């Protein structure tokens, strides 16, 4: 016999189902699932982090009481705070990269805070490549890279060479400081170019880029840099609970190999040292192909990781900056 459900019953069933879903969404689970996952009776809550009244960048105190400054910083702080994956990866990668980059900045006379410029340029991704072709941690375009002495080609691309690209970035930043005399303005030139910033300073009769009306990308860039420093100075204040074991340790480099001949197969060199080609390239991201012709006899310094050291105990990882982690 065919059963017919009345409209009244359909309405009742639908209402009960909706009520059940709503209860599930807003009160959380009342029982643990089969995987014994923890549960919460409190729904997700987004909060707006407290902003500082001032920030010191490259030794200069920057007041944030003005409406435009405060609200521009607020936007970037929120972007970092709620872009959980990117910000966590930036912090994890920084533990590996900052010990390499910081001494170079110091040696070249560039303020330590410019390591955060590297972070906002590439998220600390050694293989980063933008849609317009800027590459590496410091996001050099090919012609700019060549003008600062970096080799850019099919087999070798030194925009991905951490030390050399950092030195090239320092050279650019130093030249910009010689012209503008203000480090935050120098940072703006890294995004918009010296000519563009100089023209706007002249037309708007200001002295510093932070007070300029700029295209949205560059305007945000300045405050993204300040936000990066703010977040990295105390991640836990912005909801990032990280332990030592979560950070990426520096690569264990066993030795440096000098090569001035053709390399028919990088994998052969890797295997000779107990490595995979991928592991060799992780330490030398400037290697772009599985082989390297070298007609000029140029000398290349190749970092050889300790194959045993690549297998590590996360619990033994040491934080480069103690303020990044919680006990």
Task: Describe the function of each predicted region.
Residues 244-274, 298, 326-327:
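Primarily a LysM-type cell-wall glycan-binding module
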Residues 190, 266-271, 279-281:
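Short alpha-helical segments in extracytoplasmic peptidoglycan/chitin-binding modules
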Residues 2-109:
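An acidic, Gly/Ser/Thr/Pro-rich helix-cap/linker signature
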Residues 230, 271-274, 278, 285-288:
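Hydrophobic alpha-helix feature that most strongly marks membrane-spanning transmembrane helices
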Residues 229, 261, 306-308:
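Non-catalytic surface loops within mature trypsin-like serine protease
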Residues 65-248, 288-293:
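Catalytic glycan-binding domains that act on GlcNAc-containing polysaccharides
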């Amino acid at each position: 016999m065919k059963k017919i459900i009345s409209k009244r019953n359909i309405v009742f069933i639908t209402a009960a189902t909706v009520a059940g879903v709503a209860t599930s969404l807003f009160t959380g689970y009342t029982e643990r699932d089969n995987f014994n996952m923890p549960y919460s009776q409190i729904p997700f809550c987004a909060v707006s982090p407290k902003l500082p009244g001032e920030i010191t960048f490259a030794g200069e105190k920057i007041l944030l009481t003005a409406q435009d400054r405060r609200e521009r910083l607020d936007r970037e702080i929120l972007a970092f705070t709620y872009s959980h994956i990117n910000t966590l990866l930036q912090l994890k990668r920084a533990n590996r990269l900052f010990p390499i980059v910081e001494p170079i900045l110091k040696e070249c006379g560039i303020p330590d805070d410019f390591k955060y410029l590297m972070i906002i340029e590439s998220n600390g991704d050694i293989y980063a490549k933008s849609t317009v072709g800027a590459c590496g941690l410091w996001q050099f375009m090919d012609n700019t890279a060549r003008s600062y002495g970096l080799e850019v080609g099919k087999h070798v691309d030194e925009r991905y060479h951490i030390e050399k690209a950092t030195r090239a970035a320092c050279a650019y930043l130093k030249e910009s400081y010689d012209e503008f005399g203000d480090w935050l303005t120098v940072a703006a030139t890294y995004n918009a170019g010296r000519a563009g910033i100089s023209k706007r300073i002249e037309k708007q009769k200001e002295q510093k880029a932070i007070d300029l009306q700029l295209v949205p990308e560059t305007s945000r860039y300045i405050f993204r840099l300040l936000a990066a420093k703010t977040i990295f100075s105390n991640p836990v204040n912005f909801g990032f609970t990280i332990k030592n074991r979560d950070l990426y340790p520096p690569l264990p480099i066993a030795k440096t190999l000098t090569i001035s001949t053709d390399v028919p197969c990088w994998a052969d060199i890797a295997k000779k040292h107990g490595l995979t080609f991928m592991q060799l390239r992780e330490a030398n991201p400037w290697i772009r192909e599985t082989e390297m012709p070298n007609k000029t006899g140029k000398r290349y310094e190749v970092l050889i990781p300790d194959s045993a050291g690549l297998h590590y105990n996360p619990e033994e990882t040491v934080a480069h900056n103690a303020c990044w982690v919680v006990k």
